[in-house]
Each structure stands twice: as C-alpha cells, then as structure tokens.
C-alpha cells in the first residue's frame, strides 16, 4: 500500500516521523524486587545487554535464560529533537510488553500499563529535552493464572501444549512526533450495500483549538486513481461522517466498488490531512477494504457469497525467538507458506500477532480469526484483566479487513465450569455483547470448541484420527451433539441452558498429527513415522470433514511444530515435512455438499 514503510509497527495508521527503538538495551534481573527502592530509574544497575524486542528467554535476545525472573529492567538513551518539540508531542509506544510495564524518562515516572498483548503508549513530552534522554523500563510478570497468558507455562517446565514463558518486552518499541493538533484515531467501517465507508475520527487538540477552522480531509484512491475526497469540520473531539467510494470515472471505465476477497484482496489507499486555519498540521496514511462478512442462517457470507473456510491453527512461535517474529520477512514467509498449503485463512491461536502480520494478511488475502490469550482461573481479577485487554485489542485491530471473526476464549480456558456455572456463563455473554458493542459487523465466537453460550458460529474440536468415524459422528449424531445428548471430544457442544439456534458450524480444530523422525514430542492420536502414513491420515480425516454437509469450514492443527509439540505441517525452522502441493491438493479438492464454494 502507498502508506507502507518496512518495519513500521502500526501499519494502518502511519506517520513518517518515527524512530525504531529496537536493538541493544542495558538489562538486568531484579529477583529481590529492589530496583524501585534503590531507584534504578535514576542510576541503572543492570549488568547485562539484551536485544530488544526479544525476551531474555530466547536465543535472539542474546541471553537465552529460560528460568523464571519476575522483575526485570531495561535502559537505553533516546535522542530527541528539541526543535520538533515546539509543535509536537513525543510519544513512546510499546507494541507488546508482558505484563506490568512501568516507564521512567530522565528519572521521572511516565506511567504504567497492565497486559501483555495490546499496544500501550506514553506521552512523555513534558519529561524529555533536546538531545540525549534516559529511558528506563521495569516489567513485572509472574506465573499467575489469573492474568491473560495464552500458551505461556505457569510452572517451571513445559507441559502439554504450554511452552516457555514470555517475560517483558516482546514486540517493537518505537517513538513518534505527533502534532499538538492531530488525528488520534480513525475507525473505518465499510458499507458494501451503499458503496460507502463510515469514518469515525478522534481528534487530539486543546479545547481552544476545536473551532470552525479545524478540518479533516480524507482522500481515497485505488491503484493510484483518486476515487473520492471529502472535507469535514472537526470542531469536536469525536467526528462521524460517511464517504461514497463508488468510482464512476469516465464513460467505459466505471468499475463501481472493488471488494476484498482471499482470491482478489483489493485494498483502497486513504490519506488523512488535518488543517487548522488553512495550514496542514497533521497527515496520516492508511488503507481499507470494501468487504462484508455476515451470517445468513447456517451459512457465512463474504460479500454476499457463501464462504467455505479452509483454516489452519497458527500459534506464531519461532525456534529462536518464541512469540516474537524474528523479522518482518518471517511473517511474510509464514503467510506465503500457508497459502502454498492450500489454506485461505488461519486461526491466530492464543496470541495477538504483530500488526505487520495483519497488514500482510490484508495485502495477500489471508482470512484471520483473532483470538485472545487465555487466563486459567476464574476470579473477579481475571474478569477485569481479560475484559480490559480484549477491548483494547478489538479497538486496536478493528480496521484490518483480514480479520473476519473475533474469538475471545478457547475450550473453556479460564471458565472451566462454564457448562453448569451461571457466573462463568454470564461472563462469556458479557464479553460477547461488549465485543458486539464495538464491532457490529464481525461474527463473535465467545468460547471456541465446545460449551458455547451465545455465539454467532458453533465451533467443534475433534481430534479423531479415523476419517470414517469422524464423518459418521457428525452425520449420524448431528442432532444429538447439538442438543448435547451426545458429547463430542468428551465435551458438550453447548453449555447448560443454551440451545442450538441454526448457526453455521465449523470443525475449528482437528488433525494435530504428530510426525517427526524420533520419539520426542507429542501430537494428537497415534504418531506417524513416515511421510506416506502422514499423507494417508491427513487425506482421510480432511476429506471426512469436508464431506460433512452442514459444516462450512475447518481448521487443521497446526502450521508448525512448537517446542515439544510436533504436530505441525512444518518444523520450527519452517521446513515443510511433506511437499506442500500434496497438502494443497487435498485441501482444495472439491468434495461433498460444499464443492461449489471450496
């Protein structure tokens, strides 16, 4: 897209005056939690170096210590341009830092943030000066199962499908100069039926500047051709408007609206300019897509057409950097290889991925289910932390067209008694309706896999390894499964008190075939040791799922091996275990009721 800058962290809201703060930082463990008392933010006492944004547990950090350290400190100098400070604010951004992040600049406290997966930002304008400034960060983390932790272990060793913990900064740290009168955010909602885009602007300005001389101009273009331009008055902090994006052009060149699909992921550029008293004071580059995702009875429609989803579970782990992508190129490689395997989408599992990943999914046409990292205990504190961060994530990633489904919870993790316990059921309902209050256009699957309460799609997890058994289970016992008379995978499809209401049904986890050449690691079912055995089982169960007439999609587990879990289609270095064209042919083979839409 026109606004694209390599390695820029916030790909949907781009300013050019920024600095990447990744690289070598001073670092230290504070196992006695003495740093604040000893004022490390004034005189740093850490004795190590770390390569940010990689956590100390990883090889790429330069430390590679997998033991638990609950209190850690970072330090570096930052250079600030005093001339730019005259008309700008200086903002520090942390794309991801787990879990409690505290920031000091030049020894003065700048603020804190709780949560590990959403972006946090600090306006430190009043704490910096021209030239070199001291930036100090403390991060507190723990094995507390009440906090959202996703696939991070909460004991000292890996177990099951839980892996080495991620402590501290694990995504890009960066700074930008933001004009004092500026665009704080833009929420973009496509209206395909009316060929329009709804824009909701948030303006950052002093009250005295919110006058009739403050304007926002949006310019929409498609592949270099200007489609629409609109200027609106911005004399209040929240401004809503709608812009028509149908292109009429000259006679013979009309093409109306270009829609976004996995096959043709057409995107529009949109540029924003804020003017005050006739002078441009802020510019932001972005993009959007005209696409509609909605539920129609048992079908999921993309732009009004039935969508069959061929998804793969993607946990976003790398051998030497764990949750942190080693580079932007690694993100692109994953997307390209997932496409090569014949999938049109992915379920980003228990992780909010780097926003650059979402950018490339937008550009390359990869469907995404966005999922929250789970907590593993139900308490008032867990409810508060989960809800707060989930709302931050939905708002942060709302504009990405690749995201077609929100999935706050998985397999009753954090709500382990949801089948019968009303308070846990109420929590999932609250999360569902809160998500809907922010986003009316996307389906929400509150508890993926089983024990659903309110949900726009009913999803089922089943790791049966015999295709015929799998097929018969969901054709001969469909009604009993959906009325909970028969449990699938030992679990009820719906929680007590809830009924199936005709929603679309997807097998959103299956497969997980363990395949490597030694006896280490694990997967689901009996392990296979040869390529031929793997292909036979993969074909058997995938074909069985696709033949289920009412099932409108599937999600195979998983993209790559993750530490002790060896059930990926690739190993941790992203080498294919089986020729991708073989997997692609099986995935894309048209069978059963859905063959028209596959």
Predicted regions and their residues:
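Accessory carbohydrate-binding/adhesion or oligomerization-edge regions at the termini
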Residues: 1-62, 138, 142-147, 223-225, ...
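Accessory beta-strand-rich segments of carbohydrate-active enzymes
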Residues: 7-12, 26-32, 64-183, 225, ...
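Aromatic- and glycine-enriched glycan-recognition loops and surfaces
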Residues: 66-72, 80-88, 120, 263-266, ...
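Extended acidic/polar, glycine-enriched regions
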Residues: 126-132, 202-294
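N-terminal carbohydrate-binding accessory modules
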Residues: 186-187, 271-338, 443-445, 589, ...
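Conserved, compact domain cores that house catalytic/ligand-binding motifs in diverse enzymes
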Residues: 197-222, 300-369
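Substrate-binding/catalytic cleft of secreted carbohydrate-active enzymes
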Residues: 335, 345-574, 582-587, 593-598
């Amino acid at each position: 897209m026109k606004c694209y800058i390599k390695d820029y962290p916030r790909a949907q809201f781009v300013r050019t005056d920024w600095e990447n703060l990744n690289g070598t930082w001073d670092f230290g463990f504070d196992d006695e939690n003495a740093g604040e008392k000893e004022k490390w933010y004034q005189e740093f006492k850490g004795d190590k170096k770390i390569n940010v944004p990689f956590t100390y547990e990883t090889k790429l950090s330069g430390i590679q210590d997998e033991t638990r350290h609950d209190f850690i400190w970072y330090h570096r100098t930052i250079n600030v341009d005093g001339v730019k400070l005259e008309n700008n604010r200086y903002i520090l951004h942390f794309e991801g830092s787990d879990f409690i992040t505290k920031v000091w600049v030049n020894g003065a406290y700048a603020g804190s943030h709780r949560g590990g997966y959403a972006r946090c930002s600090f306006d430190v304008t009043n704490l910096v000066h021209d030239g070199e400034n001291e930036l100090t960060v403390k991060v507190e983390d723990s094995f507390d199962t009440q906090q959202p932790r996703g696939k991070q272990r909460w004991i000292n060793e890996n177990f099951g499908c839980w892996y080495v913990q991620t402590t501290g900064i694990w995504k890009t740290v960066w700074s930008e100069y933001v004009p004092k009168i500026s665009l704080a955010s833009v929420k973009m909602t496509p209206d395909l039926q009316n060929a329009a885009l709804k824009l909701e602007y948030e303006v950052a300005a002093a009250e005295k500047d919110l006058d009739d001389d403050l304007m926002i101009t949006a310019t929409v273009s498609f592949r270099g051709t200007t489609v629409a331009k609109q200027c609106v008055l911005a004399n209040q902090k929240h401004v809503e408007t709608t812009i028509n994006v149908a292109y009429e052009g000259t006679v013979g060149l009309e093409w109306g609206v270009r829609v976004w699909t996995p096959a043709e992921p057409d995107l529009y550029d949109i540029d924003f300019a804020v003017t005050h008293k006739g002078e441009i004071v802020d510019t932001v580059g972005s993009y959007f897509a005209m696409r509609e995702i909605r539920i129609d009875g048992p079908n999921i429609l993309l732009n009004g057409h039935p969508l069959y989803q061929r998804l793969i579970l993607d946990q976003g782990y790398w051998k030497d950097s764990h949750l942190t992508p080693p580079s932007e190129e690694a993100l692109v490689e994953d997307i390209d290889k997932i496409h090569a395997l014949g999938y049109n989408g992915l379920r980003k599992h228990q992780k909010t991925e780097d926003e650059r990943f979402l950018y490339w999914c937008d550009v390359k046409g990869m469907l995404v289910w966005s999922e929250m990292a789970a907590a593993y205990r139900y308490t008032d504190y867990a409810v508060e932390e989960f809800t707060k961060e989930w709302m931050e994530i939905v708002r942060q990633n709302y504009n990405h067209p690749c995201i077609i489904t929100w999935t706050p919870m998985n397999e009753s993790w954090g709500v382990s008694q949801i089948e019968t316990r009303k308070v846990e059921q109420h929590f999932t309902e609250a999360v569902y309706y809160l998500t809907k209050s922010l986003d009316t256009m996307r389906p929400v699957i509150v508890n993926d896999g089983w024990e659903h309460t309110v949900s726009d799609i009913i999803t089922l997890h089943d790791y049966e390894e015999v295709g015929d058994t799998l097929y018969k289970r969901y054709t001969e016992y469909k009604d009993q499964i959906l009325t909970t008379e028969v449990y699938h995978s030992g679990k009820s499809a719906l929680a007590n008190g809830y009924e199936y209401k005709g929603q679309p049904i997807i097998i959103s986890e299956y497969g997980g075939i363990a395949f490597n050449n030694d006896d280490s690691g694990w997967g689901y079912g009996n392990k296979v040791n040869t390529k031929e055995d793997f292909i036979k089982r993969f074909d058997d169960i995938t074909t069985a799922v696709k033949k289920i007439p009412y099932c409108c999609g599937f999600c195979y587990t998983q993209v790559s091996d993750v530490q002790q879990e060896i059930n990926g289609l690739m190993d941790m270095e992203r080498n294919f275990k089986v020729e991708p064209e073989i997997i692609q042919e099986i995935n894309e083979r048209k069978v059963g009721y859905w063959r028209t839409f596959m």
